[in-house]
């Protein structure tokens, strides 16, 4: 039915496929979103660099109605990373011993995404990297830019 040459090729092909499937499995990640700019990835607490999101207990006002903008920032991040592998570039540690990093999903910056969504701010005190993303959200009145809000750093200082 099959020549010896075809049998050998078939065995090699099947063996190669099995090898590929076994050794190219993506390592599963243990990932938990803490708030809009902090995650726990494989047991490490990671704070996104260059951005600041509203605190979880922080609210904004839109047309006289309170919006839980801190919770919304967290939800946006959860939705963006759901069922995706998160990769981070470590940039050091902060005073709270958190890893400072820029993190990505499908090679796209989560920080840039959050700022352009209007639920994170370019943290100019530490980086100028996301200013253009913030300008885009502000000019288009996206997210918090369509509301009355307090900057997260002011909220923390006042509360």
Language-model features: where?
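Small beta-barrel nucleic-acid-binding modules, primarily SNase/OB-fold domains
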Residues: 1-159
